[in-house]
Amino acid sequence: MLFRRFYDENLAQTSYMIACEKTHEAIVVDPNSDVAQYTRAAGADRVRIAHVTETHIHADFVSGAHALAKAAGAVLHFSGEGGSEWGYTAHALEGANVLRDGSRIDVGRIRVRAAHTPGHTPEHLTFFVSDLARGLDPVGALTGDFVFVGDVGRPDLLERAAGAKGSTESSARKLFRSLQEFGIEPDHLQIWPGHGAGSPCGKSLGSMPQSTLGYEKLFNWAFAKMSEEEFVAKVLEDQPVPPRYFAEMKRVNRLGAERPTTPEPTWLGLPELDSAIGSHATVIDTRPAHKFAAGHVPGTLNIPLGKSFLNWSGALVPETPDFYIITETASDDAMKNILGDLSKIGLTRVAGVFRSDVLREWKVRHGVLERVPQLDSTTLKEIAGRDGLQVVDVRSPEEVSGGHLPGAIHIPLAQLPDRIGEIDTSAPVVLHCRGGGRSSIATSFLQSHGVSDVSNLAGGFDAWVAHGFEVESAKPAKSVTGRKTVKSARGRKAAKSAGGRQSATAAGRRKPTISASGRRKK
């Protein structure tokens, strides 16, 4: 048996190719839209991709199953379990082999048996893999989003991302029963999961690439002895906020996703940047946070390149309007890779790209670059509570449950686009996360939407704790006002700041007496 693992660090997503070394046939499970990586690997291993399948309808990336099966001339297999309401559509299943609980796919002398393991999604399948040259017993299981290293797939996504109202608790109960059945398999069974650490498809995924059922029984909380009621409460507790793009991915993949078209980089200059900013288009500055903080074009959104780039792009960038990118990347090939990554989550409407040199040109023409004020913990301690200063905690619910700054408002970063109206911009705002990275993104998001008096807490919650300052354990306030006080700067007529964006003050809001940086304003 030939076994290949493909891991996409930007998605924290794993797909697999398993082949029979005698017949040179292969099956690919859970491919993403970068189908070329699988065909290249098959060519290198001198095998033919004969079968393509996936464990479930994915919510976090564009499926490559249809595109790969077409490119390789392979048989496509999809789950027929879970009912029609939230399963694959008839269009997606057209021409595909429908899998049921107990269905088998023989790949030469490799046998893949499907087992229905609902909970994360209604149609979810786990694939037990046997090497018939050695015996009938499975060597391992491709568990998709059912069982991870140290965690299990969250059962709330169908409701929170796809809109299936009232499905969360019943899904959690199905997940419990699926785990009970799975737990009777032998301890030596290898577990090959669909995601690793950093994926929002669970809350505490481990970073090990694989595990065994016996190991998970010892160290995975979900296999601990507990009642169904206890499990339901625990699995639903402190789940991370799903990014906004999950809903669109669920819809696209349920219909049968085609391979997205990756746009060629179109390099633009200062006139186009002026136009983009003037029209309130989304412009993503992908430079590191410290460079963005030191000087950026007003109205731009900072999402630094790195492992979390796709996650936060999917959470903060609108799906339909065209958007732009500012990058330090110089070559076409490197930029194509970035655009290819964005296409994996359906963000293909890139209207143009600006090299970071354009910032110097902007400063020459407009005379100023905007900065992100950095506030240290000592200063925040001194000014806390003055003139209605708001502290906004953008960490996950799980992090916040372990303690938070006194009086902090909790708005997870992924929810900021939908909850920006809960922030009263007539008063200064300080944002923080654990170490300062996510709050830097959040600060830029508020600035790009016309909020002027906003600062980032340098070092975040960790720095606050390191200074020995007070931490509360009760749940933080949800908002200060409970009403919408901010509307997106995009598409509204108002006075603009020097950078071409409307500021909170220009919109007629009261100018605060004390700024978020602690300086008294005139």
Go through each PLM region and give its residues.
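Short, well-ordered beta-to-alpha junction loops that form the rim of enzyme active sites
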Residues: 193-198, 203-204, 248-250, 286-288, ...
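Active-site HxH/HxHxD metal-binding segment of metal-dependent hydrolases
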Residues: 12, 23-26, 33-116, 130-132, ...
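Active-site metal-binding loops of divalent metal-dependent hydrolases
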Residues: 31-33, 57, 81-82, 120-121, ...
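A contiguous, basic/glycine-rich beta-loop/short-helix subdomain that forms a polymer-engagement track
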Residues: 261-273
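Rhodanese-like catalytic fold shared by cysteine-dependent sulfurtransferases
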Residues: 88-92, 154-156, 168, 215-251, ...
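Histidine-centered catalytic micro-motifs
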Residues: 52-62, 116-124, 191-199, 431-435
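Residue-level marker for buried hydrophobic side chains located in beta-strands
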Residues: 27, 51-53, 140-142, 148, ...
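Metallo-beta-lactamase
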Residues: 24, 111, 121-241
